[in-house]
């Protein structure tokens, strides 16, 4: 249900983009890079069954949709690469009724490196707080490919969902960005298993204005 809501939200956003395009030309006004470091076991999430940590590298293209009196609205296109590490901590998570359960326990209890390649579209709300400092709230949804299976998620096609809250500091023709982020990775029950991963962490970004 949560993914359906996100899909509808992004559909509305793209409809708005199409309408805006009829009235004026929309083009990129900023490009940026963003680094995020997040993990499963933290202040918000804790699961004794597994450990999951990830470093995320994003390239960002910012499209201004609306400039309002209170809030500005932007769409961000974000191709990205995620380098994660996963380990099963509680072997009882794999129950004896599963086929080859002993083999699977031995396989997933080993620490493994996982790669995730994804393309994400995000809706950003931005509000100026004081001169050159703005608050940003961003909601993103994307699709990608994850390189290895685990007891929680199948290898292959997957969805990513991200929410971030942070501050941007403008300096001349560039700006720095610092935020907290919450994310989820799963595959919408296209494959089994689909327990997914939850993460919480921090983001650091740098952007350059090109308009």
Language-model features: where?
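Extracellular loop and loop/strand-boundary signature of outer-membrane beta-barrel proteins
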Residues: 43-49, 105-110, 147-153, 188-194
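Residues that define the transmembrane beta-barrel architecture of outer-membrane proteins
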Residues: 27-29, 51-57, 113-119, 155-161, ...
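Membrane-embedded beta-strand positions of outer-membrane beta-barrel proteins
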Residues: 29-35, 73-79, 121, 137-141, ...
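Short glycine/proline- and aromatic-enriched beta-strand/turn motifs that initiate or cap beta-hairpins
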Residues: 18-69, 209-211
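Gram-negative (and chloroplast) outer-membrane scaffold detector with strong preference
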Residues: 58-146
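Outer-envelope beta-barrel architecture signal
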Residues: 4, 23-31, 69-75, 131-137, ...
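Transmembrane beta-strands of outer-membrane beta-barrel pores
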Residues: 35-41, 79-85, 125-127, 141-147, ...
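Outer-membrane beta-barrel "beta-signal"
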Residues: 169, 197-211
